């Protein structure tokens, strides 16, 4: 009986301690405890590393961009040339667009549409954040001319329509900054060249038709819309505004038909309790948000 009992004890499996592996071989223990790794495993790891290195060394093929229209800079399948004027608009005003570098490659930018509607010698785009007489003598000369205006809202800005009525020299050039509001502010205040032209702003009640991009307030306009309104005032021709807005309307309509959503202004979202992002902790930014909620001009 005792011998049978001993046999049963020997046949019963020994309970493994928690966390122990099924294999208690020395190699397994060493792997578990961070000890020496078997040669075969080490060779396999080195082979994997070599394969990964070879993959990194392979030449990277550049992403293929869709063919673009040479006139409107839109992909050929969604070309907006049918909505552009057959010939560039005849204007006497020179337009300078100061474009922030971040805007240059944005898909839904409006400056190429604006430039496609105007003569090349009347519309010039300068890309950058800092400008000086040494870097851009042409722009420096333009800024110092008495007939040059810069369109940027502010307490010191004159209303454009009122200014041209009283100005002894009729404006021949207008400068517009292209970028987000924070980018435009940075360009305007950190370039002393832009202190020379007369600062003007638009006094208009129209709402932006650029509904596929969020604006800070209901009164903010895109660069193309600002140029359309300003040129129609300076040229005393409302047809200019209608013509320049046509490709913008087509762009927004096409995007909305293909899944884009109407982007309401931040002011509208705040006033109607629809703003879902957390309020900023920075006091200066928080103050701006409060001004937007109270429809105070900032």
UniProtKB/Swiss-Prot annotation:
Coiled coil: none
Covalent S-S links between cysteines: none
Residue window of motif DXTW: 178-181
InterPro entries named in the record: DTW, DTWD2/TAPT
EC number: 2.5.1.25
Region called Disordered, residue ranges: 1-52
Record Pfam families: DTW
GO MF entry, a single one: tRNA-uridine aminocarboxypropyltransferase activity
Modified residues (Phosphoserine): 132
Residues found modified as N-acetylmethionine: 1
Cell location: Nucleus; Cytoplasm
GO biological process: RNA glycosylation; tRNA modification
GO cellular component: cytoplasm; nucleus
Primary residence: nucleus
EC top class, as a word: transferase
Catalyzed reactions: a uridine in tRNA + S-adenosyl-L-methionine = a 3-[(3S)-3-amino-3-carboxypropyl]uridine in tRNA + S-methyl-5'-thioadenosine + H(+)
Keywords: Acetylation, Cytoplasm, Nucleus, Phosphoprotein, S-adenosyl-L-methionine, Transferase, tRNA processing
Superkingdom per UniProt: Eukaryota
Function as written in the Swiss-Prot or TrEMBL entry: Catalyzes the formation of 3-(3-amino-3-carboxypropyl)uridine (acp3U) at position 20a in the D-loop of several cytoplasmic tRNAs (acp3U(20a)). Also has a weak activity to form acp3U at position 20 in the D-loop of tRNAs (acp3U(20)). Involved in glycoRNA biosynthesis by mediating formation of acp3U, which acts as an attachment site for N-glycans on tRNAs. GlycoRNAs consist of RNAs modified with secretory N-glycans that are presented on the cell surface.
PANTHER family hit by this protein: TRNA-URIDINE AMINOCARBOXYPROPYLTRANSFERASE 2
Family listed: Belongs to the TDD superfamily. DTWD2 family.
Name by which UniProt lists this protein: tRNA-uridine aminocarboxypropyltransferase 2
């Amino acid at each position: 009986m005792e011998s049978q009992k001993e046999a049963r004890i020997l046949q019963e499996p020994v309970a493994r301690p928690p966390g122990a592996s099924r294999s208690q071989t020395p190699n397994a223990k060493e792997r578990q405890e961070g000890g020496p790794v078997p040669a075969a495993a080490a060779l396999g790891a080195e082979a994997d590393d070599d394969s990964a290195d070879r993959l990194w060394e392979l030449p990277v093929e550049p992403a293929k961009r869709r063919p673009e229209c040479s006139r409107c800079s839109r992909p050929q399948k969604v070309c907006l040339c049918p909505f552009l004027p057959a010939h560039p608009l005849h204007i006497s005003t020179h337009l300078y667009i100061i474009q922030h570098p971040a805007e240059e490659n944005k898909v839904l930018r409006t400056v190429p549409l604006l430039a496609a509607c105007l003569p090349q010698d009347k519309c010039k785009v300068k890309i950058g954040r800092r400008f000086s007489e040494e870097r851009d003598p042409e722009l420096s000369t333009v800024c110092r001319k008495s007939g040059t205006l810069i369109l940027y809202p502010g307490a010191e800005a004159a209303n454009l329509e009122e200014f041209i009525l009283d100005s002894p020299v009729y404006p021949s050039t207008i400068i517009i900054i292209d970028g987000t509001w924070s980018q435009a502010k940075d360009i305007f205040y950190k370039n002393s060249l832009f202190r020379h032209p007369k600062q003007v702003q638009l006094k208009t009640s129209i709402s932006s038709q650029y509904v596929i991009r969020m604006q800070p307030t209901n009164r903010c306009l895109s660069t193309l819309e600002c140029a359309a309104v300003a040129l129609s005032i300076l040229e005393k021709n409302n047809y200019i505004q209608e013509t320049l807005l046509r490709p913008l309307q087509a762009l927004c309509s096409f995007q909305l038909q293909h899944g884009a959503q109407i982007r309401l202004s931040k002011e509208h979202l705040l006033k109607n309790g629809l703003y879902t992002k957390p309020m900023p902790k920075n006091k200066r930014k928080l103050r701006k948000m409060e001004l937007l909620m109270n429809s105070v001009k900032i």
